Curated annotation (Swiss-Prot):
Family: Belongs to the PNP/UDP phosphorylase family.
SUPFAM superfamilies, alphabetized: Purine and uridine phosphorylases
HAMAP family: Pur_nucleosid_phosp
Enzyme class, UniProt record, top EC level: transferase
Summary of the function given for this chain in its UniProt record: Catalyzes the reversible phosphorolytic breakdown of the N-glycosidic bond in the beta-(deoxy)ribonucleoside molecules, with the formation of the corresponding free purine bases and pentose-1-phosphate.
Annotated source species: Citrobacter koseri (strain ATCC BAA-895 / CDC 4225-83 / SGSC4696)
Protein name: Purine nucleoside phosphorylase DeoD-type
Length: 239
């Protein structure tokens, strides 16, 4: 049954959904990597599609920007459409000099300055981590594809234009591989509602060197990340 934000029916979504922030990137992923694709959501322009990858039913849908937006979509997918696994495929900014533009980062955990997980966890600190098997499958998929993916912590920020530049020094000291805006929230939603989640990011810009990719490149050229996500789903089916 349709929700306020998703005009689909039970069965329209696969049990695994890849979720970029940008709905146009969702469309690109569906058209480029999936077969027998059909649109299953278009409410508020947040496009969702279901198709098959090597015969395996998979869905892809945008989640918007920031923890509030992605939390709405992931919660509804899990509780109203039977989705079991969420794989965020997005972009992040690097703060360490050994992390380069277009590197793939597998988010084993996610720190955050958001308070949403404290709200849901009764004002205690919640360890926002990915599902271990999904991390392992993504690492194995990356190795099989010849991609040298980085594995470690992300930082999910509430502010894109942060006034606190010194925080980047702290992130670097603590080994944060990338800064984005959603992973900690998605991991919290998955934990609350009994699902599994993983975030895979491609470095789209470097906060130290000011290198950056264009909007068009972010939409269409981060194919290694998508291939890792899709192949990891197939590996999970074999487990």
């Amino acid at each position: 049954m349709a929700t306020p934000h998703i005009n689909a029916e039970m069965g329209d979504f696969a049990d695994v959904v890849l979720m970029p922030g940008d709905p146009l990137r969702a469309k690109h992923i569906a058209e480029t990597f999936l077969e027998d694709v059909r649109e299953v959501n278009n409410v508020r322009g947040m496009l969702g599609f279901t198709g098959t990858y090597k015969g395996r039913k998979i869905s892809v849908m945008g989640h918007g920007m920031g923890i509030p937006s992605c939390s709405i979509y992931t919660k509804e997918l899990i509780t109203d459409f039977g989705v079991k696994k969420i794989i965020r495929v997005g972009s992040c900014g690097a703060v360490r000099n050994d992390v380069k533009l277009r590197d793939v980062v597998i988010g084993m955990g996610a720190c955050t300055d958001s308070k949403v997980n404290r709200i849901r966890f009764k004002d205690h600190d919640f360890a926002a981590i990915a599902d271990f098997d999904m991390v392992r499958n993504a690492v194995d998929a990356a190795k099989a594809l010849g991609v040298d993916a980085r594995v470690g912590n992300l930082f999910s920020a509430d502010l894109f234009y942060s006034p606190d530049g010194e925080m980047f020094d702290v992130m670097e000291k603590y080994g944060i591989l990338g800064v984005e805006m959603e992973a900690a929230g998605i991991y919290g939603v998955a934990a609350e509602f009994g699902a599994k989640a993983l975030t895979i990011c491609t470095v789209s810009d470097h906060i130290r060197t000011h290198e950056q990719t264009t909007a068009a490149e972010r939409q269409t050229t981060f194919n290694d990340m998508i291939k890792i996500a899709l192949e990891s789903v197939l590996l999970g089916d074999k487990a």
